[in-house]
């Protein structure tokens, strides 16, 4: 009877856990958070604004903890590409290529040289237009990455049978600011942050079921929220705040004035007051 009880207990504990995947997942589009849905459902502007983004730097100086790698940064170095994508997805801005500007200029030189020599391809015979200048620049940086901001757990064990769970919260922070190209004035600035959740669940049994017979078993899994997705969400949230702030300051306007009370704009307007630490 005792053995049966132990066997049932182990089966119940293991049933609470997720089985490991049997095969690798297929390539797919990057998952997105609620901030992406809010960003893509903003009301339309009076007109789209030409914007340039040069480089969003990592100013945290943080590296992945041992034993990962002492030379791998704790946050992704692709914030510039993420910001360009967020600006385009908002349908409020027309991003201009600036990160790969030198590559673009080289291609234009090649086309002009071919046009002068008369060896240009059919699709490049039309004279090149001048590059479009931006109305504003969006600058910024990753200003903070704090690990183990909060951690905790809970567990229980009875006669060698038990389970426990632990969690840890990290935090990443981003600064974005809008700069007037004509004057260099900073028109708007915002700081956003996103927590990164990691947790672990374990269950096991360790008990002698008979003389010189030991029953021992462990099951468990861990889940780590991708830093890349959290950084993308923080940037998308920052873009929404910049758009909302620009509407309030009269920097740009809505196509339909009645959309000023749009649910998304109202929600982020209420969130514009930073919470107490």
Predicted feature descriptions by range:
Residues 2-7:
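Sec-dependent signal peptide recognition
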Residues 12-15:
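C-terminal motif of bacterial Sec signal peptides marking the signal peptidase cleavage site
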Residues 17-48, 146, 154, 166-277:
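C-terminal/domain-edge helix-coil "capping" segments
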Residues 49-50, 54-148, 171-188:
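N-terminal segment of the mature soluble domain
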Residues 70-75, 114-117, 156-162, 195-198, ...:
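Short, low-complexity, polar/charged sequence segments that are solvent-exposed and flexible
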Residues 125-126, 160-164:
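Extracellular loop and loop/strand-boundary signature of outer-membrane beta-barrel proteins
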Residues 143-160:
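Charged, amphipathic alpha-helical segments
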